[in-house]
Amino acid sequence: MRYVFHPEALNEYAEAVQYYTEQRVEVAQAFINAIEDTVYRIREAPTRYAAIDEDVRRCMARKFPYGVLYTIEQDYILILAVMHCSREPGYWKSRK
């Protein structure tokens, strides 16, 4: 199934990559790989992950404190947020 990033989710992802790049390029690459793996797992089995708010589901990234929040649309997956787990819960709700 194809996927689309909400523009604000794409910005969050880019900001996180930038942050990790400033720490170490290797860490940034590991983060990119972790998010790509998370999106792959979502695409393989989108209904596997629990709904956290109505039709919004969350899949946690491995080795990083981030979750990918998404909805399953008719013919694609909409990624609503690439959320750091210590960020204010629910900030992404207006994106649905």
Where are these regions (language model features)?
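Enriched for short, Lys/Arg-rich terminal
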Residues: 67, 71-96
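Basic/aromatic recognition patch in beta-strand/loop cores that engages polyanionic ligands
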Residues: 47-77
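Short, conserved catalytic or interaction motifs in soluble domains
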Residues: 22, 47, 84
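Solvent-exposed interaction patches of small proteins and small membrane subunits
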Residues: 18, 28-30, 50, 55, ...
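Arg/Lys-rich, positively charged N-terminal/basic patches that mediate binding to nucleic acids
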Residues: 1-32
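Short proline/glycine- and basic residue-enriched helix-capping loop/turn segments at helix->loop/beta transitions
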Residues: 39-43
